[in-house]
Amino acid sequence: MFKKVTGVLFFCLALTQCSETTDLMNRPIHKTDNAFQNEEHRLLPMDGAHNTRELGGYKTNDGKSVKWGMLFRSDKLSDISKADQQYLQNLGINKIIDFRSKEEKAEDPNIIPKGISYVEMPISVDGAMRSKIEAVLKGETNKEVKSFLIDANKEFVSDYSGVYEEFLRNLIDEDGPTLFHCTAGKDRAGFAAAITLIALGVSKENVIQDYMKTNQFTQERIEEIIDQIELMSLYQADAEILRPLLGVEREYIETAFKTAEEKFGSLENFIREGLNISDKDIQKLRNKYLES
């Protein structure tokens, strides 16, 4: 029973509804139309993805702003519609970076629109997640599900600095818009967005606020997944205990920040020393992605 429920959970996490419901002509192009350069339009209207959003508009500590239409974070793109594909092309996206593991990509291969380059940077922090969740559902462990994601955020700093260095170097070298994603668009992609914004000079609090927007943008989907898990288990499983896995908590990203700060003294030093991104590199990044 619990293996079945665990399977249902991962199926639901991977599931997206793909029906062309959003008129392509009415989708916002932030870069060329300042009417869309606001919080109301930060989440992109996608038929086959739930957490695709803009990183433009965030203010930096020196009074500049992140350019609209240059940086996008997302969940997986394996179920996007033809209209979604055209939309990504209309946004001018040059490159898609995928943080998913080999197994995740085999289960749900990305749909890459024509003319957009695709780069794989696998981060496999979820390899043992299924068995851990099954143990929680069975009551065999008192360890909270949220502790799994706390540990994962520590690993982003301790075990995957090389991947995140490669990610930032791709942004530095890329001249056009980039979209980066994982499966749910919240943990691996969330940390990538966080270090990018920190490197650009956005305050830690504003970075955390962007991280937390996942809960706002995916709330309806989270409720659907919880209802589905309870239904498939004939209400024998308490799906509520899995809620921390489906969204984000401030503690997750703060754990990553604390891990970096304890080892390197500050997030800025983590980027310089832990990710080997020099001050010259940071200036190049800012020249590309910031405006006055």
Predicted features by range, described:
Residues 1-6:
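Bacterial N-terminal signal peptides that target proteins for export
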Residues 18-178, 192-292:
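Cys-dependent protein tyrosine phosphatase-like superfamily
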Residues 181:
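Catalytic nucleophile loop of clan PA
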Residues 184, 188-189:
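Ser/Thr-glycine-rich phosphate-binding loops at phosphate-binding pockets of nucleotides
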